[in-house]
């Protein structure tokens, strides 16, 4: 069982789904409400042991994932029981990288879903803008308020989509950062099984 650290509650479905898809299980899911709170914990978590593995999902917020990872881990040593995955640009981008399932669930024309979600300046804003034009009144009301901010059921709808409808394999074909995360999670699983 892995402990998993995420930024926001709306990342829970994505994290659980990816961990389970990778053949691992979530022992504890911790939400830290913002990347700054996660960044402070990375040096400590990176010293974990195989009996207490940690997986951290942190949004890149449009920064170069490679440079961000180097900055966040420069004072740590490589530890195979610790995995930091940079979600590029953010969770909503990974979810939209499966345009077929995304368009069906959120009742949006598939051709309106961005092809390369890693190029979006702000994936969450893009998702909200798409959902504002949903054919479903329920989706519009749940996901986005009239002023464009997140709606009252944003978190539960995003998590429901991630856990039950999101096709990770399709999304990984469209999102290099998601594909890399799956590769690293497979390596973590292999390491833990050999301990």
Predicted features by range, described:
Residues 1-7:
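A short, flexible N-terminal coil/short beta segment enriched in small residues
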Residues 32-35:
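Conserved helicase motor
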Residues 2, 12-28, 39-55, 60-195:
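C-terminal accessory helical subdomains adjacent to catalytic cores in phosphodiester-
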